[in-house]
């Protein structure tokens, strides 16, 4: 067992200060026996815990608050259990509030009082509303959990607890961890709102490919184990004494970051009980040069900090553009302006001239999105048509903070114009700055053109958010990727316009050939204009005895990914096609008890409680007041041991706490 109990580090361990913003670090798996670790290095990258203060309810004692998360091959199931006692001499209302990642699906909720458990039931939204209305008419209280739009961000319910009685809340949500910039992120939000006697966060990660102890570009090593565990169990005193804490205790975000080992030319193909999942992220591919057009809104609404942060981000991005890339800059208000009439090579002279142009960008005028995007497409078409070979990836990046107010302003017309102009030849990414933008319009336009929409939050780190997005698409490796399998059905998306360095393609499906002993995958794509092919195979017999493959997880992963992709596809359709997609997504949501935009969860509570309807916030809801942040360092060999983090028999991750950040950012 790895343990360093003889080194009892103080709660406020000294670690290097962070001058600008927190950086993220991999979670390291340790397998004992090991010697006690040394202090953390200044190059470590750090996950973030935000501390949010909230009032403690008088007479209400949250005596146990547990968060347990099991991650199997990137699929995470998280269970939050809160046990509460009413110490008062009269009945009190007890609240249960949980925040979760936006792409997670709630799959279970229950309340237990006086030996009686009240379970949530997932239904169609209309049926859920009817059940709620009936419960209210009978004088009962019914909690209604709904998802608005395509996000799941918060869950709140309450129940009246008699004097000296207890209640147990339990909520389960599920998610597929997405690989971004070479790492997976598991976000856990813990907000018990008071100091808790029994506080514990227990995360268990199982990856059969192994978890590297170092994720640097030039060095990757791993321990023999394919498991890692984070066990965070602070005492009451530690919950009070951490920076920014007090009577309200710990309350905030815990971010765990890791990656897996990868053979250079192979993916990871797994089969279990008639379902399969294929993770594909090759590392033996040369970088493909790209053609990129930046389309920047400089209308009057970008006044002040927004335009300053945009300039700052563009200057940083230009510092990182490789010389073999070609690029163009377009700014627009009611008029479209091009820095150059065509795309140019990213030579030092051209980059310096582009920086001079960016420094002079000023806000003025209205917003003509249609003309700006069409001009960007025209420039790309002229440039790519003149290329002798198709060895590059071509993308457009639109940044805007408002609705179109000049030129063509009908949203459907703009989307149709852009889709026709692009013609599946290029990828369009749409970045919406702030909360006044029509995010649904931007997201739909991006999805129609093989891209994604992304919100840029108007906080102190907005420039870093812009840079971070560009980093995700800065290094294309493969284009026109096709994933092919034999003897399968109900397969998720199998074609992808681009595969970028640091990302991962995930495909899941149903194995229909009962005689199939070995599932084979053939992946085709283009690298620098040349076709490349990869092959993966997995034996049902081998996977059946693999301890890292779970029957439940692969099937639920398939259902989760299918529903997510159907909801994206449904946005782009109309008429009978739209209804068919909605029906399939609804049926899967009901079968697997997922709370999605098409379903709601009803919980009928004890008689006499107040009626209550509970909804999820819409995408784009502005964040609440700023918070102080406390950094938790997740490291491997280089760390000061944190007493509240218990060691495990096979692995552990240690924490130490630094000084809080003071810039007030919500999106660090």
What are these regions (language model features)?
Residues 74-78, 87-94, 106-108:
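Exported/extracytosolic protein signature
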Residues 83-90, 98-100:
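Asparagine-centered strand-capping/turn motif at beta-strand->loop junctions
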Residues 108-152, 158-163, 170-295, 459-460, ...:
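An acidic, Ser/Thr-enriched
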Residues 1-68, 138, 395, 405, ...:
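Pro/Ser/Thr/Gly-rich intrinsically disordered low-complexity regions
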Residues 67-77, 84-86, 160-166, 498-500:
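Short, solvent-exposed beta-strand/turn "edge" segments of beta-rich domains on protein surfaces
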Residues 284-345, 370-375, 388-400, 404, ...:
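Von Willebrand factor
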Residues 402-448, 452-456, 461-467:
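VWA/integrin I-like adhesion module and closely mimicked acidic/polar interface patches used
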Residues 323-327, 367, 391-394, 422-429, ...:
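Loop/turn elements at helix/coil->beta-strand transitions in domains of secreted/extracellular proteins
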């Amino acid at each position: 067992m790895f343990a360093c109990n003889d080194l009892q580090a103080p709660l406020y361990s000294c670690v290097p200060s962070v001058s600008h913003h927190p950086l993220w670090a991999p979670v390291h798996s340790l397998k004992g026996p090991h010697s006690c670790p040394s202090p953390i290095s200044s190059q470590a990258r750090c996950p973030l815990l935000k501390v949010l203060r909230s009032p403690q309810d008088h007479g209400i004692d949250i005596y146990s608050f547990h968060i347990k998360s099991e991650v199997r091959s990137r699929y995470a199931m998280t269970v939050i259990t809160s046990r509460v006692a009413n110490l008062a001499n009269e009945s009190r209302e007890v609240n249960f509030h949980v925040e979760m990642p936006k792409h997670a699906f709630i799959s279970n909720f229950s309340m237990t009082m006086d030996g009686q458990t009240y379970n949530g039931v997932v239904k169609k939204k209309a049926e859920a509303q009817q059940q709620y209305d009936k419960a209210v008419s009978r004088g009962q209280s019914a909690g209604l959990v709904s998802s608005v739009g395509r996000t799941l961000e918060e869950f709140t319910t309450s129940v009246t607890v008699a004097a000296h009685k207890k209640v147990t809340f339990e909520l389960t949500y599920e998610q597929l961890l997405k690989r971004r910039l070479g790492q997976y992120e598991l976000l856990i939000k813990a907000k018990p709102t008071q100091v808790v006697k029994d506080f514990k966060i227990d995360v268990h990660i199982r990856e059969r490919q192994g978890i590297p102890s170092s994720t640097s570009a030039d060095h990757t090593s791993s321990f023999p184990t394919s498991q890692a565990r984070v066990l965070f169990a602070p005492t009451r005193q530690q919950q009070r004494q951490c920076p920014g804490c007090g009577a309200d205790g710990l309350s905030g975000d815990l971010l765990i970051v890791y990656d897996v080992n990868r053979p250079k030319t192979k993916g990871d193909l797994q089969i279990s009980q008639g379902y399969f999942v294929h993770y594909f992220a090759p590392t033996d591919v040369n970088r493909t040069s790209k053609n990129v057009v930046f389309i920047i809104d400089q209308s009057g609404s970008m006044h002040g900090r927004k335009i300053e942060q945009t300039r700052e981000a563009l200057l940083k991005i230009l510092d990182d553009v490789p010389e073999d890339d070609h690029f163009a800059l377009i700014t627009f208000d009611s008029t479209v302006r091009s820095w150059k009439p065509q795309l140019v090579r990213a030579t030092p002279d051209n980059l310096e001239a582009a920086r001079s142009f960016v420094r002079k960008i000023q806000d003025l005028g209205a917003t003509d999105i249609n003309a700006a995007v069409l001009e960007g497409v025209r420039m790309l078409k002229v440039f790519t048509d003149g290329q002798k070979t198709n060895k590059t990836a071509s993308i457009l990046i639109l940044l805007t903070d408002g609705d179109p107010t000049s030129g063509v302003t009908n949203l459907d017309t703009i989307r149709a114009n852009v889709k026709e102009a692009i013609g599946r030849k290029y990828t369009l990414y749409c970045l919406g700055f702030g909360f006044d933008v029509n995010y649904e319009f931007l997201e739909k336009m991006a999805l129609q053109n093989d891209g994604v929409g992304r919100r840029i939050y108007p906080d102190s780190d907005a420039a870093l958010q812009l840079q971070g997005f560009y980093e995700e698409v800065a290094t294309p490796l493969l284009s026109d990727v096709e994933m092919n399998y034999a003897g399968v059905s109900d397969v998720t998306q199998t074609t992808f316009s681009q595969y970028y360095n640091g990302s991962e393609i995930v495909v899941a499906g149903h194995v229909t050939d009962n005689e199939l002993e070995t599932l084979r995958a053939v992946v085709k794509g283009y690298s620098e204009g040349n076709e490349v092919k990869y092959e993966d195979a997995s034996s049902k017999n081998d996977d059946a005895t693999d301890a890292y493959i779970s029957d439940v997880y692969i099937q639920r992963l398939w259902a989760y990914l299918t529903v997510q992709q159907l909801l994206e596809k449904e946005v782009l359709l109309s008429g009978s096609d739209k209804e068919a997609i909605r029906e399939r997504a609804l049926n899967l949501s009901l079968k697997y008890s997922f709370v999605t935009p098409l379903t709601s969860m009803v919980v009928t509570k004890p008689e006499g409680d107040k009626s209550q309807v509970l909804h999820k916030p819409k995408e784009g809801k502005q964040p609440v007041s700023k918070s102080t942040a406390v950094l938790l360092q997740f490291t491997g060999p280089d760390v000061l041991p944190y007493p509240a983090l218990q060691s495990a028999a096979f692995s552990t991750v240690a924490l130490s706490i630094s000084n809080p950040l003071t810039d007030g950012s919500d999106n660090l």
